[in-house]
């Protein structure tokens, strides 16, 4: 009976992990299948299974060799190599143990990374060592296994098994690395030093290098455990001497050592490519000394190691000559490494430094060209712009469309107002406000700039007594609605105007008489429909809907309104098996006995839109914040529903730190290549995800399209109503600006001298000086062009406040993604934001007014200073907000404007512009001439 119970118990222990694995696979399959992408998940499983099988064959071969090598042979008992005694024996023990410990420590770390962050494995050596408890536990287990097997070969085999399991896990979880290496196409750009296509660095180099590292780790583990088993036999430890290896054992070690040398040779050969993305010289990539010293030395060392590997193998030639050849080859390999360490700094000081520009000039040109291409700076269209010194009425007429969209509301004051007036309940949150444009005036070409903020539900803000399991997962399941405000209008009380505000029966849709926008136009072009936000930016737990419990929908005054989810998202919970699998997946057995599930109940997982996209495409980087749009959806589209209007737009990026000759970012981030390759659209109600390729020429995304063709769609197939709201992501634009500060220069001599370096100017926001962030404007890049939606960044020379240029990113229609650099004349000083703000604050009347408000208990907040092109002039606009010191609402009180020759402060923009033109003020208008020599 006891034996039967023991057998059943062992079978149960094996069955439990099997059930967990099957449950997780089932839930994941259902999750992908809701997007009709079950094939993507199946392909990923097959890739991992294939990788694990390949790794298993390799580690299995190593284990069989080890077992064969350790098998005793009676006929060779007396054939021994020289004896190791004393310190030599101790040194061999120590070396073997250090190799064993090092390999298993690296295996443990890589296995942990493979489990939690598999797409970081290609640059694992640059990541900080994690000391979290899971890794610590694994390390303790590893050390225990080693100590347990120190003196027993049989037990030491457990460490071999542990390391082999780690390798299989690592190879399986690295499916993305291997897939991209096999699928990435050539870009057609060849780097000049080694003649390889740049796609080798983008996709293949990391896979080959990582594969060789894994081979080296497994071979080192196998050899060290085998040798340790021989070195630590009981007679050896008691005598502190090792009688030596038999001839068969010595010959058996040769193939293993040869493979180790081949792996080192391959890594050293690949290290030649690493010269292409070093950052040690004056620019990125290989310089003169790298090409003329390091490249030959590394090539020589690699070839020497490869030949040495073949010489180590058993051979019929004379052992004396082969021993001499081995010594010569080993000396060459070691000498090449030593010479690199010694000669490089010496030759740099003696040879390169005295004539650095002459020697490095062609390599500087390569670095400039590569960096500009890696960040798409080579596609910038440069336009000279010589603004007039004074604003004219003709400029106002030419720039009328720009004036109609001058932004007076910053995101932060608007969010502060929303949080006090529009959150309505403690658990609602406005986490972000996005500047966008909508066609609210059909008679005009340009679209109205607005700020749209989603009203999400924050589970963490629920009162403590309401944070029950049922409330968190069945009742409080979604946010509701959004607010929309014009950027250029305010109410009589100085608070923002709203096109859309409040919720439920109190929901208001308003036009704006001052902007000549009717309520009907707002209602038509910004439909609301079902504004429930089941998927959003805030982290949210899983939800179960619909159930017999009604979900909180929105408040109606003091009464709450309830509803049932009728969307298409989620994992079915109709059968008992599906519920068991779901409860195991979410690790919550309460789902089984809740008693409120219905046949159509579904489990909503990954409700954070970025996590949702990341789960489908883990190879994408998701930078920046998603933004919500509400658009009329045309009927007849297979993948969209005309009764659903709220969608999140998420920007997906492909990047690499191994693009030849490209520079890293100025802040030290290891990124040398970046593309905004994907635009993801996430339905805020139904949770559907669509991935559109926005950079079809990017070799990395083309490689992923080969692997998962069903996952991507061309950008042209995106509904027009959504395409009209695409924007150049500010997160990428900021990185391009960082690189442009130095790499706007294309002349190697000027680049080397550092005479023409730019910087991002600073401005005063509130009481704090901050860098001017990129801002959206609707403006004309040229008088001959229509106004368009731009992302703009002013630029000034290093250590000087005058404007040197603007970088503008275009987001409209056929010009999406184009970069335009407006260059100002260098011989005429153009005031920068910092100078204009200083002149504003130095104005006696303006500073006196600020002081009066301050003494009256209000805090003056100087908003973002905008510099916009207007006709043939520049217009500087700064909104002034007042806020009570103790959490009051920010109100738009004044607008300061300047054209560089005068500064005026008035109640509104139009009054300020008129004062600038006339050059005279009034009771509520301050005007002052500026000193042009400042």
From Swiss-Prot:
Membrane topology: Multi-pass membrane protein
Main localisation: membrane
Annotated TM spans: 2-22, 45-65, 86-106, 129-149, 165-185, 208-228, 251-271, 300-320, 327-347
HAMAP family: UPF0182
InterPro entries the UniProt entry points to: UPF0182
Identification of the protein by name: UPF0182 protein sync_1321
Keyword terms of this UniProt record: Cell membrane, Membrane, Transmembrane, Transmembrane helix
